[in-house]
């Protein structure tokens, strides 16, 4: 009995003690969380009450936020001073790495910044990605906040680690002229550049292959070898057509083995002489699985040869932006003026060759561009893509639905283009790379390499601009490097439905008439074999078709084949008439093959009138293959002729 009562009392006492401890723990935990909660609401009275009860002033919420961080975030300098006096740690960060000084600097809050610095915060503390408080304050534009940090020894030329930008670049990007002046007076380097980086590359395609006809033949070999049981005899036929008799001693089976292991990409368009990838006709090494692959003559490389070979590392070709480039990009003339007065070079370029003038033009900041020209900017300074202010201005005026948004210009585009021409812009300059507004859609069948501003204007049917360029000496007979004429571009070569900008269908017709009047040959074949009529037929521009045929355009001209028509090796190398494009049989790049019945009808009528036998209506790729082209040894390209 006694033992039972004693045991019961001990059990009761333990339950009471546990309840008291749990209550105390809950009370303490609540108080620790509550001080940051109170600060988040700006409840100073509650904070003072909690501090008197002994609450931990540095207690953190679930995300690491403290009361001092909330005071900085809310811009409450008085509360920040109270918390600092109570022992708040000014360098304590939340789980994202944000400190009270980081939050205050981002807001440009000079009063809170001073309170934190007085309380022991480090003006040069390292934030995530190497950012410094001065960079954030400079970006905010608050001059007093920048003063406060500089007065406490902030490094004016420190750079963050992600892109290598400095406080000067941050201020320039936001157009804060007064902050720029203050930073320069404290020794900011106006010539400093951000970190070099790699630019995004472009995928090679038939439109920019060095030899489109060989690219088509390579595609045929790839399709043959990709079959479950490759027809090695047909592979031999196609290889001899491509490489001649020199390929006779090679193993077709080994070649196909490499293609099967690597996929169709093993035989790439670039293998025909382009800059990307490798394959039949390109420099390659051993396959990852040990299969032999091909050398530059189409001969297999023995297993083990070239093991461990790696292409040389590419040097960064992007980045290295200066503060003046940032200012030009943002369009702040006041910021640019301060930087130039501080010694910035108006023609200093980025790693890819972007000058401040190019950056301003690319972003449609034409008032800024004019200001830079007035201060010595070279109007013909091109970047590594060969893009000049004139070409970019023409491109902006006729912008496509591209990969990059384009701002609304702050000056009439034709006024700016005229200004550039009057200042000596080279009207016949040829670019060397497709511009950034060129999408993967258009880049795959119209490469801008070698294009002039005139050709770019022609593509969009900008008749008014074409006449202006001619008046300033434009040569209408300069083609792209792969032989696309301004007439072909205007007619539809490179056209992508829903992407390519056109002034209007009517203006395009007038543009085609104008280009013909300048003496451009409508039957000039590009390296792909296409003529202007192929483009008009693919686009479904019926009236343009009529104009071209009336001007002597031939309807029996075949292209040199198309890597985008697959399904059989012979379809891959089949050559196509303009009527085939109108019938929706030819896919170009990622642009769908769209039938245009009205254009097809008109072309058939015109073919009959010219004594040509038009193909039957209602054709499909499947029916075409059955009755016409899918035969062993079929060679419409005549690559060795």
Label each residue range with its predicted role.
Residues 15-25:
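Bacterial N-terminal signal peptides
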Residues 37-41, 70-76, 103-109, 136-142, ...:
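Ankyrin repeat A-helix N-terminal signature
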Residues 46, 78-79, 111-112, 144-145, ...:
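Conserved ankyrin/ankyrin-like repeat signature
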Residues 64, 97, 130, 163-164, ...:
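Start-of-repeat signature of ankyrin repeats
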Residues 59-60, 90-93, 124-126, 156-160, ...:
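Ankyrin repeat boundary signal
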Residues 51-56, 81-89, 114-122, 147-155, ...:
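Ankyrin repeat domain, specifically the short helix-to-loop turn at the C-terminus of the second helix
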Residues 30-70, 79, 323, 327, ...:
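N-terminal segments that cap or nucleate solenoid repeat domains
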Residues 584-641:
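Terminal, low-structured helical/coil segments at or just beyond the last alpha-helical repeat
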């Amino acid at each position: 009995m006694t033992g039972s009562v004693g045991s019961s009392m001990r059990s009761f006492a333990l339950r009471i003690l546990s309840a008291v401890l749990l209550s105390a723990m809950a009370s303490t935990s609540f108080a620790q969380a509550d001080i940051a909660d109170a600060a988040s609401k700006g409840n100073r009275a509650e904070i003072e009450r909690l501090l008197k009860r002994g609450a931990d002033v540095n207690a953190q919420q679930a995300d690491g936020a403290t009361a001092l961080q909330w005071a900085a975030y809310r811009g409450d300098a008085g509360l920040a001073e109270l918390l600092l006096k109570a022992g708040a740690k000014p360098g304590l960060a939340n789980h994202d790495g944000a400190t009270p000084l980081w939050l205050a600097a981002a807001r440009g809050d000079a009063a809170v910044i001073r309170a934190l610095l007085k309380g022991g915060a480090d003006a040069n503390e390292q934030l995530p990605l190497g950012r410094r408080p001065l960079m954030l304050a400079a970006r905010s534009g608050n001059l007093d906040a920048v003063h406060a940090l500089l007065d406490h020894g902030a490094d004016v030329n420190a750079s963050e680690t992600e892109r290598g930008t400095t406080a000067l670049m941050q201020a320039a990007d936001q157009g804060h002229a007064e902050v720029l002046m203050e930073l320069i007076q404290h020794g900011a380097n106006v010539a400093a550049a951000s970190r070099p980086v790699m630019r995004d590359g472009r995928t090679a395609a038939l439109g920019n292959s060095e030899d489109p006809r060989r690219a088509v033949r390579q595609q045929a070999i790839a399709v043959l070898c990709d079959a479950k049981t490759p027809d090695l005899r047909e592979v031999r036929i196609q290889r001899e057509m491509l490489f001649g008799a020199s390929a006779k001693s090679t193993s077709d089976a080994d070649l196909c083995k490499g293609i099967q292991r690597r996929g169709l990409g093993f035989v790439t368009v670039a293998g025909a002489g382009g800059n990307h990838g490798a394959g039949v006709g390109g420099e390659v090494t051993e396959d990852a699985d040990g299969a032999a692959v091909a050398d530059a003559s189409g001969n297999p490389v023995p297993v083990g040869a070239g093991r461990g070979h790696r292409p040389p590392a590419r040097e960064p070709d992007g980045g290295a932006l200066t503060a003046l480039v940032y200012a030009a990009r943002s369009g702040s003339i006041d910021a640019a003026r301060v930087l130039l007065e501080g010694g910035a070079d108006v023609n200093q370029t980025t790693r890819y060759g972007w000058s401040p003038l190019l950056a301003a033009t690319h972003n449609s900041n034409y008032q800024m561009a004019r200001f830079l020209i007035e201060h010595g900017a070279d109007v013909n300074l091109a970047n590594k893509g060969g893009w000049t202010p004139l070409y970019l201005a023409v491109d902006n005026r006729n912008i496509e639905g591209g990969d990059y948004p384009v701002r609304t210009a702050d000056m009439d585009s034709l006024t700016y283009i005229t200004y550039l021409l009057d200042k000596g812009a080279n009207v016949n300059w040829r670019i060397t790379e497709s511009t950034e507004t060129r999408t993967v859609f258009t880049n795959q069948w119209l490469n801008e390499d070698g294009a002039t501003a005139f050709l770019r204007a022609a593509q969009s049917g900008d008749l008014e601009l074409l006449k202006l360029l001619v008046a300033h000496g434009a040569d209408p007979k300069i083609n792209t490097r792969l032989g696309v004429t301004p007439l072909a571009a205007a007619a539809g070569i490179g056209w992508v439905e829903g992407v390519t900008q056109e002034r209007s269908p009517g203006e395009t017709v007038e543009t085609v008439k104008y280009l013909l009047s300048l003496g451009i040959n409508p039957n000039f074949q590009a390296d792909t074999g296409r003529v202007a009529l192929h483009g008009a037929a693919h686009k479904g521009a019926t009236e343009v078709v009529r104009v071209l045929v009336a001007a002597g355009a031939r309807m029996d001209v075949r292209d040199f084949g198309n890597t985008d028509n697959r399904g059989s090796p012979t379809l891959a190398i089949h050559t196509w008439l303009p009527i085939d494009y109108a019938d929706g049989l030819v896919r170009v790049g990622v642009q769908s093959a769209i039938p245009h019945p009205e254009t097809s009808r008109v072309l058939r009528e015109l073919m009959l009138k010219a004594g040509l036998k038009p193909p039957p209506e209602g054709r499909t790729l499947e029916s075409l293959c059955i009755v016409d082209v899918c035969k062993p040894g079929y060679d419409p390209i005549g690559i060795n002729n």
